[in-house]
Amino acid sequence: MIAYAIGLLGLLIASIQDIKSREIENYIWIGMAVIGLLLSTYLSFTTGNFMPIISSISGFIICFIIGYLMFVLGIGGADGKILMGMGALIPSYAFPVYSSLQPLYTMEYIPWFPLLVFFNGVILMIVLPIYLFFKNLSNGVKPKKLKEYVLMLVGEYITVAEAKKGNKVVLGKGKDVKLIPSVNDDKNYDLSKYKDTQYVWATPELPLLVPIALSYIITPFLGDKILSIILPM
C-alpha cells in the first residue's frame, strides 16, 4: 500500500508537470524506482523471500526496454520514464475485483501491474476523440466534408480567445487546416495572426500521463477486464 501511495503521488506530480511544460523532472521517476528497490530489498530480507527484489529489478528492466523503445519511436519520453519508475516501485498488485488472466500473474518477474496501467491508460486516451466529436456537435459544428468529420475527432472548433487560455496546438482555419501538425513547430502556437473572435481548429494536446494517472487509480478495481475482452483466454 505504501508503494502504491508513492506511485500515485509521483504520477500526480508528473501529470501536472507534463500538462504545464510537456516534460517531467527526472527526480520523479528515479525517486519511484529507487524507493521501489529499497522497499523490495527490505521486504526480501525481512521475510527471507527474495521474490520481491527479483520482481522489482526485472520490472525495472522490462519497463526500461519498453520505455526506451517508446523514446526511440517518438511516442513519449515522459510516459516511458514513469513506466520505468512503476516497474521498480510496484511491479505487481492484487486485483480483488476482476481478473480473468489470473494464471499469467504467477510469472512474478513480469511487471503486470505497470503494463496493465499503461494499457488501460491508452484505452482511456482513445476515448478522447469520441468526447471531442460529441462536444463539437453540442457546440453547433455541422460537418459537411470527410475532413471536417476527422477534425471533429482530433480537435475543437473554438475561438482564438478560447485557444489562448490553454496549451493548444492550432490546426488551422479554413483550407489551411493540418490534420497532423508538428508539436515542435512554434508556428502552431502562434495565434497573433488571428483575431480573438475568429474560429480555428485546435487540439487540446492532452498528455498521455493524465489518462495513465487515471488508469493507475481505477486499474486495481477494473483489473484486466478490457484486455480480456480484446484478448479472450
From Swiss-Prot:
InterPro entries: Arch_preflagellin_pept, Preflagellin_Peptidase, Prepilin_IV_endopep_pep. Its EC number is 3.4.23.52. The keyword Transport does not apply. Changing residue 18 to A/N: Loss of preflagellin peptidase activity. Disruption phenotype: Cells lacking this gene are non-motile and non-flagellated. The flagellins of the mutant have larger molecular weights than their wild-type counterparts, as expected if they retain their 11- to 12-amino-acid leader peptide. It is an enzyme of class 3 (hydrolase). This is Preflagellin peptidase. One of its GO terms (cellular component) is plasma membrane. The chain crosses the membrane at residues 2-18, 24-46, 50-72, 79-89, 111-139, 208-219. GO terms for molecular function: aspartic-type endopeptidase activity. It catalyses: Cleaves the signal peptide of 3 to 12 amino acids from the N-terminal of preflagellin, usually at Arg-Gly-|- or Lys-Gly-|-, to release flagellin. It is a multi-pass membrane protein. Residues 19-23, 73-78, 140-207 are extracellular. It is found in: Cell membrane. Optimum pH is 8.5. Changing residue 186 to A: Still able to process preflagellin to mature flagellin. Keywords: Archaeal flagellum biogenesis, Cell membrane, Hydrolase, Membrane, Protease, Transmembrane, Transmembrane helix. Disulfide bonds: none annotated. Cleaves the N-terminal leader peptide from preflagellins. The processing of preflagellins is necessary for assembly of flagellins into a flagellum structure. Residues 1, 47-49, 90-110, 220-233 are cytoplasmic. The gene is flaK.
